[in-house]
């Protein structure tokens, strides 16, 4: 009997990952937001055929929204200031807040470094949500507190596709394990509110919300026990 090693044998492994990412919005998403960041928690299981299946949860975070003057201009004075309770200035910061969850499958199509590492593709399908999140640093502007914010937050939900080209490196000594890659998120969404207070118009159209980005994933591998060969 002999023990399988990552260096010379294809192994079954569970991969737990934590990933920062940077995305550029495209299509309808670019009409609402500037570039944004994401943090991903992932689980993938690789079998002895170098095929994968798993789950990703992405949390989106951005610090800049397009057209804020148009969206919130009706709530400011002639100088563009937000006047809070008791006549104090309110400090308002608007950004993107969102999430995406996908079920993924994929495979290594070109091995490199060892039989468990190399270039791979992952394809996932799931759900996506994005909205404008407004932070009131002094808590003194009730006009943009719930439920009033709902008329301005551009909350959208819909079905999503996540396509990734990645390089996977599983260390021969099981110490340093990571993925780097390029990802395209494609979502077809619709406004949950159905109406925008600032425009006074119905918002019922489907949106094509795309984003493209780069990510780095730090992996914790958990190998199947007692893998051996004759």
Region roles according to the model:
Residues 163-230:
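Predominantly the C-terminal beta-signal and adjacent terminal strand-loop region
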Residues 20-22, 41-45, 57-59, 101-107, ...:
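Residues on the lipid-exposed face of transmembrane beta-strands in outer-membrane beta-barrel proteins
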Residues 16-18, 22, 58, 140-145, ...:
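A generic hydrophobic-segment detector
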Residues 1-56, 60, 217, 221:
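Short glycine/proline- and aromatic-enriched beta-strand/turn motifs that initiate or cap beta-hairpins
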Residues 27-32, 64-98, 130-158, 189-197, ...:
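Extracellular/periplasm-exposed beta-strand and loop segments of Gram-negative cell-envelope proteins
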Residues 36-38, 48-50, 96-102, 116-120, ...:
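Short connector loops at helix/strand junctions that flank enzyme active sites
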Residues 3-13, 48-50, 110-118, 170-178, ...:
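Short loop/turn motifs that connect adjacent beta-strands in outer-membrane beta-barrel proteins
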Residues 55, 95-133:
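Internal, conserved structured core segments that host functional sites
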